């Protein structure tokens, strides 16, 4: 007699800070998924707007975690929120979602199908639909050659889906308060690439990714002082991982130029 197939549980972890304006849209995009075996965990990082009031309205449908103390290390606020949600999760597959972004209706169904059909897959990046004001933009994805820099091209945080076992391994190594300008998507992509020499891009546009005027990325306009400092931290992070993974730390033009500029 064949063993009955159990539909695996998906855990969607929403990281929120002062995004009451978009939070309903974010949560509703998960509640309305075509895939039904989903738990939703929303982690609020001491929001000062009406986010908690929004979350209260969903208390019967989602699990809410409130950070009692806001951390002060840039990207670590968000990483800490995702980690707190992760340790409470029960799903086989973990989906990260920033509270100003949202999923297409069939995203979870399609991503889990991709995982289940490819047992060697541990990590999937789908493609973002960029939302800027009233515009929606789908950029073509092209993987770059690693001649100039030390990391792969990848999609943003809300496009990450990961098996729980790998997420546990990654958080154990990457949940550290160093490299405050380096966000979770970069940490995961670089760690996985260095360890496995590739990352898997699922070439379907399944995540709406908002480009907001108050986005942290605006502080890092290309070639400004902050941009160069973050690039320096990115190279330092790669070196940190190479040491952890016992890999050779290579020098390249980008790394040399970045170090020179940061000395000026």
Task: Give the residues covered by each predicted segment.
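Cell-envelope/extracellular polymer assembly enzymes that use nucleotide-activated donors
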Residues: 8-11, 29, 39, 187
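Glycine-rich, basic loop-to-helix element that forms the pyrophosphate-binding segment
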Residues: 68-89
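A conserved acidic beta->alpha catalytic loop
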Residues: 44-53, 69, 98
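Catalytic core of nucleotide-sugar-dependent glycosyltransferases
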Residues: 148-149, 207-213, 218-249
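Conserved donor NDP-sugar-binding/catalytic core segment of glycosyltransferases
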Residues: 106-137
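Short aromatic/hydrophobic "clamp" motif used to bind/position activated sugar donors
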Residues: 94
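Conserved nucleotide-sugar donor-binding catalytic segment
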Residues: 126, 145-222
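Short, well-formed alpha-helical segments that are part of the catalytic scaffolds
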Residues: 19-32
């Amino acid at each position: 007699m064949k063993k009955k197939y159990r539909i695996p549980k998906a855990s969607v972890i929403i990281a929120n800070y002062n995004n009451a304006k978009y939070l309903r849209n974010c949560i509703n995009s998960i509640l309305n998924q075509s895939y039904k075996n989903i738990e939703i965990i929303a982690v609020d990082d001491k929001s000062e707007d009406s986010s908690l009031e929004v979350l209260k309205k969903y208390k019967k449908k989602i699990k809410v975690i409130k950070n009692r103390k806001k951390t002060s290390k840039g990207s670590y606020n968000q990483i800490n929120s995702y980690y707190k949600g992760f340790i409470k999760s029960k799903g086989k597959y973990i989906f990260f979602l920033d509270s100003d972004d949202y999923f297409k209706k069939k995203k979870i169904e399609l991503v889990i199908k991709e995982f289940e059909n490819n047992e060697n897959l541990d990590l999937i990046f789908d493609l973002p639909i960029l939302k800027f004001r009233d515009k929606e933009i789908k950029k073509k994805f092209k993987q770059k050659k690693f001649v100039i820099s030390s990391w792969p091209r990848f999609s943003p945080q809300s496009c990450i889906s990961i098996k729980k076992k790998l997420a546990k391994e990654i958080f154990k190594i990457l949940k550290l308060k160093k490299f405050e300008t380096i966000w979770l998507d970069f940490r995961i992509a670089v760690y996985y690439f260095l360890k496995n020499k590739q990352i898997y891009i699922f070439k379907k546009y399944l995540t709406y990714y908002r480009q907001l005027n108050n986005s942290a990325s605006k502080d890092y306009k290309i070639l400004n002082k902050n941009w160069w400092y973050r690039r320096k931290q990115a190279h330092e992070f790669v070196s940190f991982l190479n040491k952890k993974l016992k890999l050779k730390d290579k020098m390249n033009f980008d790394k040399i130029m970045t170090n020179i500029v940061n000395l000026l």
